[in-house]
Amino acid sequence: MPKKRASNGRNKKGRGHVKPVRCVNCSKSIPKDKAIKRMAIRNIVEAAAVRDLSEASVYPEYALPKTYNKLHYCVSCAIHARIVRVRSREDRKNRAPPQRPRFNRENKVSPADAAKKAL
């Protein structure tokens, strides 16, 4: 039977067993190397309260702390939430990360990036 992908959907290579992690969406237990991992970096303070805090702060130019969460998704939840997409056989061989869209000040995609995407 043909193999669908060279990595078997994992990043194990030589390790017999990998500890499981839980999917943040459905709590399914999946091997840590198979899970789709994303970092969620957010400000602890919401955008509406940032100005109030900076005015009330004793320290000038105080950098507000951020939360750093590593999110683990199972394959089915990652596809359902469009974190990863299903790709064709030829595109599956491409290991490079996809191009990230560049936004200008009005949160619009720049024309140069839109032209690259159209090709």
Curated annotation (Swiss-Prot):
Sorted UniProt keywords: Cytoplasm, Ribonucleoprotein, Ribosomal protein
Lineage top rank: taxon: Eukaryota
A GO MF label: structural constituent of ribosome
Presence of the UniProt keyword Ribosomal protein in the record: yes
InterPro entries: Ribosomal_eS26, Ribosomal_eS26_CS, Ribosomal_eS26_sf
Positions of the UniProt region annotated as Disordered: 1-20, 88-119
One Pfam short name: Ribosomal_S26e
Subcellular localization, as worded in the UniProt entry: Cytoplasm
Basic and acidic residues bias: start-end ranges: 103-119
Keyword Cytoplasm: yes
Entry GO terms, CC: 90S preribosome; cytosol; cytosolic small ribosomal subunit
GO biological process annotation, one example: ribosomal subunit export from nucleus
Gene3D superfamilies membership: Ribosomal protein S26e
Function field: Component of the ribosome, a large ribonucleoprotein complex responsible for the synthesis of proteins in the cell. The small ribosomal subunit (SSU) binds messenger RNAs (mRNAs) and translates the encoded message by selecting cognate aminoacyl-transfer RNA (tRNA) molecules. The large subunit (LSU) contains the ribosomal catalytic site termed the peptidyl transferase center (PTC), which catalyzes the formation of peptide bonds, thereby polymerizing the amino acids delivered by tRNAs into a polypeptide chain.
Further details from the record: Present with 16300 molecules/cell in log phase SD medium. There are 2 genes for eS26 in yeast.
Subunit organization: Component of the small ribosomal subunit (SSU). Mature yeast ribosomes consist of a small (40S) and a large (60S) subunit. The 40S small subunit contains 1 molecule of ribosomal RNA (18S rRNA) and 33 different proteins (encoded by 57 genes). The large 60S subunit contains 3 rRNA molecules (25S, 5.8S and 5S rRNA) and 46 different proteins (encoded by 81 genes). eS26 interacts with eS1 forming part of the mRNA exit tunnel. eS26 interacts with TSR2.
Similarity section: Belongs to the eukaryotic ribosomal protein eS26 family.
Protein name: Small ribosomal subunit protein eS26A
Organism listed in the record: Saccharomyces cerevisiae (strain ATCC 204508 / S288c) (Baker's yeast)
Source species taxonomy: Eukaryota, Fungi, Dikarya, Ascomycota, Saccharomycotina
